[in-house]
């Protein structure tokens, strides 16, 4: 925790010293996120994994402890220009004893400086430099980030252009496979008809040549998003096209990058929140993807998932959830047997939260029972279920943000 203490001290010191730099009383910010889960099945343990949450829904399918603690302060103001320091530490912990030295691992996720109001022509525009979550976009019920280039770099966002907003970022990345690359991201969002908006974004990924590898990894991801609000909720459709040897990196998840996996992928998502009737609501996520890679065995993959979470408000501070998820993937390779993966999940949960009529109300405590089934487990790297088995897990979860 020494790293956390040093970070807190640095931000506090910056805030305290700010009035000496400019005649300005700083505004301090404290925000964060946490979740924790525990449960057991017939064997006395949970099979829950991060990958499983992304595939069939996270309700009743998380057993880790994860947290993010953010601190920030507006440390100086000159006329209408405000200078802000932002920081965030991520903490992961397993179920080890708290007195074990390796129980919690702090990671620095954000540390950057933002300037708002520097441009006389657009006082809402913000310029940033440092390590930052760069306008991440996710689907909450599966914890799936479909647009995430977060890292160390610089950029500008909320820049007015016509009827919409423009942003541009440059981010550097290194991954565990010693692949070094740069991401160039531009996005433009603008309103359409009443309640609707459209965003177009493009990420170009450029690999770096090394003495050992002269081949340059380049890739591109184009993203189109249509958002529609209505009286009973909202809906979003996202279409993505990724191409090139580095197309996985363009999504901000470069951990499986390889220099011999040139190819293309096409993916469509639909997700949103709907009021069915009165106190009965539903959140859903559906997607479908096809990909082909020009590797030594001409790998082709097809992947799909459907997750629905209906929920009903019982009282002012209680509600009941159900969540149903199904996932499938098929991998085809020349001269090899097809690999198939199938997972199905059903969860029922009783939840306590300050405002049970608001899906996003937190903190929330949940008590759940989950049925989980996995078949066709030829894909040996898949965790979260035993091949051809059915498990029932019961447990509790908590989630909060502030």
Q: What residues fall within each predicted segment?
A:
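Extracellular structured ligand-interaction cores
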Residues: 29, 66-68, 84, 108-110, ...
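Short strand-coil-strand connectors
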Residues: 116, 162, 229-231
